[in-house]
Amino acid sequence: MLKIIQGALDTRELLKAYQEEACAKNFGAFCVFVGIVRKEDNIQGLSFDIYEALLKTWFEKWHHKAKDLGVVLKMAHSLGDVLIGQSSFLCVSMGKNRKNALELYENFIEDFKHNAPIWKYDLIHNKRIYAKERSHPLKGSGLLA
């Protein structure tokens, strides 16, 4: 399941619901990654734009990989502004045992960092400045010559 949430994530609420689901399904593995906006240089926070249709397609591929491994994959990401100390990204992989859940967890997070259609901006003096040096070009993107 993919959730796009305006502003910072309420990780307590999300994790509570996901953990209850894991318990109801009698899963023994519950792997969590939470991205927290950290203080860096003179930023107030980060801001995110999302190409929703592409993100849904990208996530669906991972959802099917997870299902093939007997793992349930959950992801939530912020849209818009997220201040220092708040969470912008949460993913959970859960399954019967740790092996498949952990394997998927690492690969998913790395692929997310490089291929998810989410654009990051620094918030500096209440202005959004594209974080080009911390961004990765999407495969197949760019201008046609």
Swiss-Prot record:
The keyword Transferase applies. It catalyses: 2 [molybdopterin-synthase sulfur-carrier protein]-C-terminal-Gly-aminoethanethioate + cyclic pyranopterin phosphate + H2O = molybdopterin + 2 [molybdopterin-synthase sulfur-carrier protein]-C-terminal Gly-Gly + 2 H(+). Substrate binds at residues 36-38, 97-98, 113, 120-122. Keywords: Molybdenum cofactor biosynthesis, Transferase. GO terms for molecular function: molybdopterin synthase activity. The lineage of its organism: Bacteria, Pseudomonadati, Campylobacterota, Epsilonproteobacteria, Campylobacterales. The keyword Transferase applies. This is Molybdopterin synthase catalytic subunit. Converts molybdopterin precursor Z into molybdopterin. This requires the incorporation of two sulfur atoms into precursor Z to generate a dithiolene group. The sulfur is provided by MoaD. SUPFAM superfamilies: Molybdopterin synthase subunit MoaE. Gene3D superfamilies: Molybdopterin biosynthesis MoaE subunit. InterPro entries: MoaE_sf, Mopterin_biosynth_MoaE. GO terms for biological process: Mo-molybdopterin cofactor biosynthetic process. It comes from the Bacteria. CDD domains: MoaE (cd00756). It is an enzyme of class 2 (transferase). Pathway: Cofactor biosynthesis; molybdopterin biosynthesis. Belongs to the MoaE family. One of its GO terms (cellular component) is cytosol. It comes from Helicobacter pylori (strain ATCC 700392 / 26695). Its EC number is 2.8.1.12. Heterotetramer of 2 MoaD subunits and 2 MoaE subunits. Also stable as homodimer. The enzyme changes between these two forms during catalysis.
